[in-house]
Structures are given as C-alpha cells and as structure tokens.
C-alpha cells in the first residue's frame, strides 16, 4: 500500500512544474522516500524520478535546479 503526500511544487516560467512527493510504503507507514513528478505546461507527465535514500532538501534542490535549467531530465 502506497500513500503520497505533496511536499512542494516548483514552476518554470513556461508553466512546467516539478512536484515533490513523499511516498509512504508499507502498512506501518514508517517507510518512505521522496519522488519528483515533472509535468509540461499542459500538465502532461514527462517523467517521475525517485530518490529512495535522499533527504527532502536534496530532492527539493533537484526540483528547483530543473526549473532553473541546471538539471536536465534523462531516463534510464
């Protein structure tokens, strides 16, 4: 069972968005990780990136860096 909690949102000038979520796994709710969902200006999902061993600050920095054009999206 997974539950998601929106932690923060970061926007590009063109309306694209990076949403940072906390994903809680397991029945006890004690295990979790952070994830970013990237969407284009029309709301179409571009990619999801999971960060299972990173702190919230690290993940939020990654989302902000994408919005600033510092981080590029690469799958794989």
Where are these regions (language model features)?
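Intrinsically disordered and other compositionally biased segments
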Residues: 16, 29, 41, 74-75
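Intrinsically disordered, low-complexity, compositionally biased regions/tails
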Residues: 19, 30-33, 47, 61, ...
């Amino acid at each position: 069972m997974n539950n998601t909690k929106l932690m923060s949102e970061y926007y590009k000038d063109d309306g694209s968005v990076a949403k940072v979520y906390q994903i809680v796994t397991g029945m006890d709710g004690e295990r979790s990780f952070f994830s970013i969902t990237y969407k284009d200006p029309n709301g179409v999902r571009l990619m999801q990136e999971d960060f299972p061993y990173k702190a919230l600050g690290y993940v939020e920095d990654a989302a902000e860096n994408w919005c600033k054009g510092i981080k590029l999206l690469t799958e794989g």
